[in-house]
């Protein structure tokens, strides 16, 4: 029976076709072989402005990690979320209700073929809208930083 390859061995066996991303250079191919989650910097830097507490932020990041296709919203089970988060089911449910009330997400209950309740589908269009609304503020702040940098580098220009 062949021996399973480790993440490191698989990553090293992959032919070098492209230059490694900065993320891959930081974390290495073994870590990156398990994938990554795209988290917009506006979400990270704007957490306070968005009114997100740490638990809510972490829940959103977990949901983002399940969102692979823009046309297919994530639908992790509460059990899967709880395996990743250090909180009780009651606390998770409260934070999800709060995120829904704040307009970050919308839940849609799935049902199985037998008519039983399945996991929720989490529509994150509210989060996307809120981040797009914040983008101009971040553009302005970037322009101000650039102007200050230019002034420092060329004070008499």
Short names for language-model regions:
Residues 1-30, 126-157:
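Charged low-complexity intrinsically disordered patches
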Residues 1-84, 90-91:
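Short recognition helix of helix-turn-helix/winged-helix DNA-binding domains
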Residues 58, 121-123, 157:
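Generic structural signal for residues positioned in beta-strands
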Residues 90-148:
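Winged-helix/helix-turn-helix nucleic-acid-interaction surface
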């Amino acid at each position: 029976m062949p021996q399973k390859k480790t993440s490191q061995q698989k990553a090293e066996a992959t032919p070098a076709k492209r230059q490694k991303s900065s993320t891959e250079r930081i974390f290495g191919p073994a870590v990156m072989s398990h994938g990554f989650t795209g988290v917009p910097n506006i979400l990270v830097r704007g957490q306070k402005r968005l009114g997100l507490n740490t638990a809510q932020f972490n829940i959103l990041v977990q949901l983002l990690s399940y969102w692979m296709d823009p046309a297919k919203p994530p639908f992790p089970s509460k059990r899967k979320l709880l395996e990743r988060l250090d909180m009780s089911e009651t606390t998770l449910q409260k934070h999800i209700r709060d995120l829904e009330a704040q307009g970050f997400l919308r839940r849609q209950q799935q049902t199985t073929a037998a008519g039983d309740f399945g996991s929720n589908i989490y529509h994150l269009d509210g989060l996307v809208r809120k981040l797009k609304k914040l983008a101009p503020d971040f553009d302005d702040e970037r322009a101000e930083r650039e102007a200050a940098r230019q002034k420092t580098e060329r004070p008499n220009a």
